[in-house]
Amino acid sequence: MPSISDDDDRASVRTERREAAVAAFLQQTPVIYQRDVTVHPRAAEWATQTETAPVCLFLTGAIGIGKTHTAWQATRQWLAAHITRTGRKPRIETWRSTALFDALRPDSHDWDVRTLTRHLQEADLLYIDDLAAARVSPTGWTQERLYEIFDERYINRRPCLITCDVLPGATANIVGDRVQSRLREMFRGGVLLLEGADRRAGDAA
């Protein structure tokens, strides 16, 4: 029978693992988003990934409202909660939309598209920043890869976090009709409109 000291040791190891993982992730975070901020209660709820929390979170609002800063903070909280719950360090993929769409192009020289697609499908958390900043390729190739990524994550209930200036239902001109339809399903109950003053007037957004 496990003793109390065994439980304490396991808890201590898990705490050390969590703190080390969060510190490492913080070092990978862009400098202006490393400062802690208070996140909206619904974003904090998503980060806990409890049974009542939405699997996916879509942060929207005006330019400069703080979507990206909120997203990085919520991702750190999600990371800590995941390790507390499972004891395992998750794999988190963070991408700016413009870089992601370029990487998914069939003529990409930096990535094997099929390998990258599978990598993004299987990550424990996929965070895409500023979705409205990018546009799909006219050939439809990027649309197909995006659909494969989002569909696989949707059917396996793998968390996604997206920041965007427009609502999921208004993303057709960005990602195409098919992907837009999947996004609307994925983020049902997980759309959060952030409101307030433009933080870029005197701070990071």
Residue positions per predicted region:
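Conserved catalytic network of the ASCE P-loop NTPase/AAA+ motor domain
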Residues: E51, T84-G87, R118-Q121, D151-N156, ...
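Active-site signature of alpha/beta-hydrolase-fold catalytic machinery across serine-
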Residues: Q73, Q77
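Loop/turn-to-beta-strand initiation segments
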Residues: P90-R91, E122-L125, Y154-I162
